[in-house]
Amino acid sequence: MRTAGRDPVPRRSPRWRRAVPLCETSAGRRVTQLRGDDLRRPATMKGKERSPVKAKRSRGGEDSTSRGERSKKLGGSGGSNGSSSGKTDSGGGSRRSLHLDKSSSRGGSREYDTGGGSSSSRLHSYSSPSTKNSSGGGESRSSSRGGGGESRSSGAASSAPGGGDGAEYKTLKISELGSQLSDEAVEDGLFHEFKRFGDVSVKISHLSGSGSGDERVAFVNFRRPEDARAAKHARGRLVLYDRPLKIEAVYVSRRRSRSPLDKDTYPPSASVVGASVGGHRHPPGGGGGQRSLSPGGAALGYRDYRLQQLALGRLPPPPPPPLPRDLERERDYPFYERVRPAYSLEPRVGAGAGAAPFREVDEISPEDDQRANRTLFLGNLDITVTESDLRRAFDRFGVITEVDIKRPSRGQTSTYGFLKFENLDMSHRAKLAMSGKIIIRNPIKIGYGKATPTTRLWVGGLGPWVPLAALAREFDRFGTIRTIDYRKGDSWAYIQYESLDAAHAAWTHMRGFPLGGPDRRLRVDFADTEHRYQQQYLQPLPLTHYELVTDAFGHRAPDPLRGARDRTPPLLYRDRDRDLYPDSDWVPPPPPVRERSTRTAATSVPAYEPLDSLDRRRDGWSLDRDRGDRDLPSSRDQPRKRRLPEESGGRHLDRSPESDRPRKRHCAPSPDRSPELSSSRDRYNSDNDRSSRLLLERPSPIRDRRGSLEKSQGDKRDRKNSASAERDRKHRTTAPTEGKSPLKKEDRSDGSAPSTSTASSKLKSPSQKQDGGTAPVASASPKLCLAWQGMLLLKNSNFPSNMHLLQGDLQVASSLLVEGSTGGKVAQLKITQRLRLDQPKLDEVTRRIKVAGPNGYAILLAVPGSSDSRSSSSSAASDTATSTQRPLRNLVSYLKQKQAAGVISLPVGGNKDKENTGVLHAFPPCEFSQQFLDSPAKALAKSEEDYLVMIIVRGFGFQIGVRYENKKRENLALTLL
């Protein structure tokens, strides 16, 4: 064993330190030989001192004679060890003591030149217990060697990154990036590779002092440790330009073991010290070849001694490894990178008090920040910055919808701007990455702008764990939902509300809502309303991008969904039907027998037969589905029972105007007066249980309709033919009278003849009405009847137009579109006020439609008319003579430019009867007016710039926040248009 007398052999000690584990196992011998080869490369000792080591290692344990001789020579100077207990034991003890002695002399001669004596004394004080124990024989020696092996293995385990198995990491370091791509290209590529694992940000850094030039590395920061772990395992072989990238984890506990302040405050444990020592023995890029150069690179006993002394706090902590300054900075703040302020750089370097503000800022996420929205405020911009500069700098973060740069006016020196993205995730990502970056010459400051409330919400933070039913269940608490655009698995969704108040309430309360767990919270922001739904109206045939609520959710809360379905335009109904029934191709099939026979008797050439039959079928299916969802056998008879009090002037508040849409398009006040609708009513009475069967088994709306028609075809054929013949006869007798004035039929008393002519007049086009009704009915516009024709006046301009009924009661339009003094028909409607298209005012119009009831409103479609339809009355002639005739699209363009609707008080000239009053609103094409249009109405309009939607509500002689027109400004605007 080792004593103080064996210090005089320090020159040969380096050779023996490498041979320590040779006496353990063959596997240990191989590993030690590899390490010895690595150690021989940087060693500075003489070649003649290394050659005996090679000979010893080649011979292994067979050269016992030479080892015995050496042990005898060295044992003479330290005979007081008590190691002379037999020849074999003496040889083994001498060999072990030589190993320890050589390591100690190596540490004293090479590593600690100035403090060799102190080091030697430490070794002696530590090795004396082992010397006493070694006199016991081979058992003690083997246990001592086993203990050394255990200490080595424990030290190796403690030197693993992160200091243990429980360490977490949220940051991945990507190195070996090469120099082919720019920093922005690398950052974009890494972001797109890792964004699928969770919320991520990427930072590119250049590390100086590593090799011949600066090394470029990337730090990928995740919000959750499990996301970083999944990304590291999934992206283990990332390739860039055919070069595999190196991915390393930056552990959270690695920084603590390296900080002197942390060691002073918290005494280091053995595992932390092991990580520190292991870190110094394995510097980056050095491998295992630098083991002998580290302070802890002594023998096994000395290493264990150092660990014990560090745990007790007697020795100062080891010096930190020579890391570059930039790398040290990056490891100080990788977790505060995403939301760092651009004007405060001190907290990036400091790890003490300076890091606390960053930790507080990092806590403010989009889920918690009430100011977070898709609009960014850009401050400290260069005075020469342009929109293209900002788009070029921010375009990589997402879709930019609007850029607004505010130039400094007189007395101001700062330039700022606003940048609007498509959603909150894009703006948040841009805010984190571009804060403090230099654009042209100035480092910009980025904050959130002011949110613009809309009725459409963007909801982020979703995933496969959020079903559509759960999303609808959580958001329908705040108001009626019109549509939800979401596919399960998407990361965000769009929710369209009916009112602005409901959307604002959901925006306020659902931000940060834990939908799917405490770590999966929602991000909510307002979104644009016009783009998505205009596409649905312009292209109705492709499949929609949202799913209908599942059956389970439909059974849970049918009432809110029914309310949303009543307010949804019919076109969206058809798209939802296609989602429910993907097996149907939705190609218009041959029309049913009832439709074909009716057309054959009433027309000569069925010009609009496919479109009309398809629209009738879809309208009937929408109505049947609404009734079937109520799950009541007698619900189909309920609308007919309501009609009796409605005809006598009663109004019902429990029916929304949209729910009566399919029935109200027929130009008759009551379905009882129409032979066609009477036959359909009889057909529904004949199979009374169809609603329950439709609810339980309905593979397709068209199939159900065909089945019911084929079932009752035989006993209803005669009734259909008689109804068609009677309608054709009534049409021939009453058409010339209606050609003179479409309103004279309303002056008669209630009877079957006027109502029949009303039902047949829905097949007349505007040109046929103006020509006296003598043209054939084949070119008629389907399901739209002419309710009024004349001039719309706005100051000194008149616009010929025709109005066709879309929804509601034709009697409302007939009774209010008259002269107040004489009661005769009115040929001109003069717009004197306008209503701003604000959401609260639009909600008020909708509320008044509901309050008025089915018999209290009428919705008309105004299209361009002919100048030949000008009335010959003296007052009309005088007004039109002093005004300039212009096309209707000029009026539409003016109202769209003003973002307003025209307002007309009815009847014209006032009326003493307060009960027979109303108001007309003329809406230009907008989201509010488009909900009342369907395919036949759009076919009649022919263009988005040539129609107005007229809403007449009875019983309201006052207006909602209207604004009187300025005559000079009005004339100038119309002249320019």
Swiss-Prot record:
Mutation effect (residue 898 to A): Disrupts interaction with SETD1B
Region of interest (Disordered), residue spans: 1-167, 256-298, 555-778, 865-884
Domain SPOC: 777-956
Post-translational modification Phosphoserine, affected residues: 109, 179, 208, 210, 253, 257, 259, 292, 294, 365, 622, 656, 670, 674, 700, 741, 765, 767, 781, 935
Modified residues annotated as Phosphothreonine in this record: 568
Major subcellular site: nucleus
Biased amino acid composition, Low complexity: 119-130, 151-160, 866-884
Membrane topology, record value: Peripheral membrane protein
Oligomeric form and interacting partners: Component of the WMM complex, a N6-methyltransferase complex composed of a catalytic subcomplex, named MAC, and of an associated subcomplex, named MACOM. The MAC subcomplex is composed of METTL3 and METTL14. The MACOM subcomplex is composed of WTAP, ZC3H13, CBLL1/HAKAI, VIRMA, and, in some cases of RBM15 (RBM15 or RBM15B). Also a component of a MACOM-like complex, named WTAP complex, composed of WTAP, ZC3H13, CBLL1, VIRMA, RBM15, BCLAF1 and THRAP3. Interacts with RBPJ. Interacts (via SPOC domain) with SETD1B. Interacts with NXF1, the interaction is required to promote mRNA export.
UniProt similarity note: Belongs to the RRM Spen family.
Protein name: RNA-binding protein 15
Gene of this entry: RBM15
